[in-house]
Swiss-Prot record:
It comes from Prochlorococcus marinus (strain MIT 9301). GO terms for cellular component: cytoplasm. The keyword Protein biosynthesis applies. It is an enzyme of class 6 (ligase). Homodimer. This is Histidine--tRNA ligase. Belongs to the class-II aminoacyl-tRNA synthetase family. One of its GO terms (biological process) is histidyl-tRNA aminoacylation. CDD domains: HisRS-like_core. It comes from the Bacteria. Transmembrane segments: none annotated. One of its GO terms (molecular function) is histidine-tRNA ligase activity. The gene is hisS.
Length: 426
């Protein structure tokens, strides 16, 4: 029988790998909390119709990449490929009109059937931030600045911000008519994939990575020439406010993002350290999405960050585990019982405590404590347990003033003083 293996494009993460993940997630949550952004959790599994209506039937995500199946009730279900549509659905279903202004974040696994490579998996993890009900340029700038600051805080190098405006629905409609006419006239000069997009999702051709097509597109109509005065003024104000905040940017007039729901501001943050998979964060405004899905007219803007790519880029210092504060060495039936009780008591001090359960010799337990670089150790043998006491010392030191103490199991005050003087004040 063949050995069971994980599916291609999924990975197992073990404790030593998760140190960096947990440190990255901790920093993310700290930054979001400081910005007064609240968490929302939505199901991983949704009705397929949600993504067809929300993302767009002609997008690559919906047409090629979704994990979709019929459940036992013959309903078409999909593992979520992104989070914005689910957030919009949740807000509509639960009465967005009662709280129209919200700043929300979510984090969790998403699923897309793509070719796996470094920083890209079929099950991947994403942080998303959504500002709901906010329509001012200031909210665009705030969310871009938040994404920029989060990535900077994580020590990501060679950051570049690319921005564009997609205008409103009328702007885009007028541009698309002209662009389609141009595409038909230049169809034979495009790569095959772009030719296939003409009838399905022509705007995505602007984002083509094909060298030949990119050269041809240099002569294509520009969306910026079809902007209304209002849309143009909004874009100018976006750039002005970014400059006030000293956030450097580059205009990319072909930046359209991969989903149909974007309007006005679109942006990506890339890192030169990532090579071909340079995009770390992408987002934009989606003022029509909630209304399009059956809710009230609600402006919104958001971004998403792929955690796998963050892990590749984040600083090495985030791989360093927190050292064990106290390692409890114990040997003997009576000692084991006391050690178990003591470990529970010590964790109330917000200490990282490891209780040795191996039953190995004292010397082997000392070696394990040394390997873990434990700051201190407690030693309990049956002799100490019978006397109702234990030895606590800073690891590697013995008989050095208050660095080592013999403490009664009942003397909580003496134990607390030792911890305060030797661990918590360090």
């Amino acid at each position: 029988m063949n050995n069971l293996k994980n599916l291609r494009g999924t990975v197992d993460l073990f404790p030593d790998q998760l140190i960096k993940w947990q440190n990255v997630e901790r920093i993310l949550l700290e930054q979001l909390s400081r910005a007064s952004i609240k968490e929302i959790r939505t199901p991983i599994l949704e009705m397929t119709e949600l993504f067809i209506r929300g993302i767009g039937e002609g997008t690559d995500v919906v047409s090629k990449e979704m994990y979709t199946f019929l459940d036992r009730g013959e309903r078409s279900c999909t593992l979520r490929p992104e989070g914005t549509a689910s957030v919009a659905r949740a807000l509509i279903q639960n009465g967005i009109s009662s709280n129209p202004l919200q700043k929300l974040w979510y984090m969790g696994p998403m699923f897309r059937y793509e070719r796996p490579q470094a920083g890209r998996q079929r099950q991947f993890h994403q942080l998303g931030v959504e500002f709901i009900g906010h329509d001012s340029v200031r909210s665009d700038v705030e969310i871009i600045a938040l994404a920029w600051d989060i990535l900077s805080k994580l020590g990501i190098k060679e950051l570049n911000l690319e921005i564009n405006t997609l205008g409103d629905t009328n702007d885009r409609s007028n541009f698309q008519k002209s662009f389609l006419k141009w595409l038909q006239a230049n169809k034979d000069s495009l790569d095959l994939d772009s030719q296939n997009r003409i009838s399905k999702n022509p705007l995505r051709i602007l984002d083509s990575k094909n060298i030949q097509t990119k050269k041809v597109l240099e002569n294509a109509p520009r969306l910026s020439n079809f902007l209304s005065e209002k849309s143009h003024s909004r874009y100018l104000e976006l750039k002005r406010q970014l400059e006030v905040l000293n956030i450097p940017y580059v205009e990319n007039f072909n930046l359209v993002r991969g989903l149909d729901y974007y309007t006005h501001t679109a942006f990506e943050i890339t890192s030169g350290a990532l090579g071909s998979q340079a995009t770390v964060c992408g987002g934009g405004r989606y003022d029509d999405l909630i209304k399009q899905m059956g809710g009230p007219n609600t402006p919104a803007i958001g971004f998403a960050i792929g955690l796998e790519r963050l892990i590749l880029l984040a600083g090495k210092e985030l791989e360093i585990p927190r050292n064990t504060d106290i390692y409890i060495i114990n040997k003997g039936l009576i000692a084991e019982s006391f050690a178990m009780d003591l470990s529970r008591k010590l964790r109330n001090y917000d200490l990282l405590v490891e209780l040795d359960l191996s039953g190995a010799s004292f010397s082997k337990q000392f070696k394990k404590a040394n390997k873990l670089k434990s700051k201190s150790i407690i030693v309990i043998g049956d002799d100490e347990a019978v006397n109702g006491e234990f030895i606590i010392r800073l690891f590697g030191q013995s008989g050095n003033g208050n660095k080592e103490e013999v403490i009664s199991f009942e003397n909580d005050i003496k134990l607390e003083n030792w911890i305060n003087n030797n661990l918590l004040l360090k």
